[in-house]
């Protein structure tokens, strides 16, 4: 759904949407629990869009969201530009097609960037990883506990005593471990991963392990619960910036890796991956600029994990326009659909959503729908399995960069 009105708080917006039927461009939509999208005012729409809700009345960047299945809340972590870019988080409650928020809480009193978060379903904790720019840009993580509409935090813990940038985070639900993958600027930007163990309100880490001995950017992660493997997707700068993925196996507080596999033989300036538990496939979405294109078209590819190896189907273009690095994918487990939210550079950089269906090693798509008729960046998605809604967080450039839902 798009943000309604000229509320400056809509720049890093969270939205809920419902999808089915024909979707005209520029119309507000809602994302249904069945993974489809419908335009407001059409007869195919079964629910109306609720009113927008601002969660941060300031420039909001690096938003990352996750669903807390214990409290049935969505947690958004972000950098608050109105408060010295402090690391901040807020709890959202979905009701129908509306979302409301508690009071934002600071988890890091310093400039915080490259934020990612996940939910530890074993101990019912939210884990946020980030770059602490006020502490030499060290890689840092903190544990959050949701209570009602509030969230509290333990003490931040450094997991990498060097500057880190692009990163991904996921929860290994087989071994109840958190895995963080990142670019280690203290080691030539090598792709590195580390295993974290949550205990109470703290987190401890094993030793970091290099998975790519080259500059590694645009890192994302997901957990394949069918094979009990961690999948990391990234841009391999050392190999012509190709889109690459690798399979990780957690054992205790360590992680080991198979061989790297290329999924896109072209410049790949962003990745987001999710696990489709219906087909037992990983879906990687990304912008790419193969030699035949002049822009970074939106792509998706289906991946199959076998042991410590990963193979791919044929990449599919879901948006024939520049999607920059603003692609975010999540899996709707009710409808068994992959939902992708992205920046559509071919349509004034409007926030746009599209629904994909995996079949074998292929993925097919319906029609895209605009959820924000303004430039939208820092997009993040999460599936609320309690309300069966997809929540989209984004920065609404056309509305003062405020965080909104």
Regions found by a protein language model. Give the residues of each.
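Glycine-anchored, exposed beta-strand/edge motif detector
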Residues: 1-48, 61
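Extracellular, repeat-based ectodomains that mediate carbohydrate processing or recognition
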Residues: 44-405
């Amino acid at each position: 759904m798009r943000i309604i009105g000229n509320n400056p708080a809509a720049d890093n917006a969270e939205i809920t949407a419902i999808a089915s039927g024909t979707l005209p461009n520029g119309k507000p939509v809602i994302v249904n629990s069945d993974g489809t999208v419908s335009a407001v005012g059409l007869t195919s729409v079964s629910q109306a869009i609720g009113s927008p809700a601002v969660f941060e009345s300031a420039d909001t960047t690096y938003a990352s969201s996750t669903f807390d299945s214990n409290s049935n809340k969505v947690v958004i972590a972000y950098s608050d530009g109105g408060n010295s870019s402090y690391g901040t988080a807020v709890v959202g409650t979905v009701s129908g097609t509306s979302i409301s928020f508690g009071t934002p809480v600071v988890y890091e009193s310093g400039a915080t960037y490259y934020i990612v978060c996940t939910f530890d379903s074993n101990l019912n904790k939210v884990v946020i990883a980030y770059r602490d720019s006020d502490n030499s840009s060290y890689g840092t993580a903190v544990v959050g506990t949701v209570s009602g509409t509030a969230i509290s935090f333990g003490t931040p813990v450094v997991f990498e005593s060097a500057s880190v940038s692009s990163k991904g985070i996921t929860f290994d639900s087989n071994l109840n471990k958190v895995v963080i993958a990142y670019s280690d600027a203290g080691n030539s930007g090598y792709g590195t991963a580390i295993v974290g163990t949550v205990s109470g309100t703290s987190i401890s880490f094993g030793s970091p392990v290099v998975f790519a001995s080259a500059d590694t950017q645009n890192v994302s992660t997901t957990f394949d619960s069918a094979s009990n493997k961690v999948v990391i997707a990234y841009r391999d700068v050392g190999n012509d910036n190709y889109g690459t993925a690798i399979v990780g196996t957690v054992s205790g507080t360590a992680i080991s890796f198979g061989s790297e596999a290329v999924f896109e033989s072209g410049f790949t300036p962003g990745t987001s991956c999710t696990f489709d538990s219906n087909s037992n496939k990983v879906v990687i979405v990304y912008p790419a600029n193969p030699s035949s294109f002049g822009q970074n078209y939106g792509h998706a590819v289906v991946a199959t994990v076998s042991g410590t190896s990963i193979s791919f189907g044929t990449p599919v273009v879901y948006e024939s326009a520049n999607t920059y690095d603003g692609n975010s994918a999540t899996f709707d487990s009710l409808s068994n659909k992959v939902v992708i939210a992205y920046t559509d550079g071919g349509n004034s950089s409007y926030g746009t959503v599209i629904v994909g269906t995996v079949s074998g090693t292929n993925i097919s798509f319906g029609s895209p729908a605009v959820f924000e008729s303004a430039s939208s960046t820092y997009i993040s998605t999460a599936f609320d399995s309690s309300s069966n809604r997809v929540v989209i967080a984004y920065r609404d450039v056309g509305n003062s960069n405020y965080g909104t839902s």
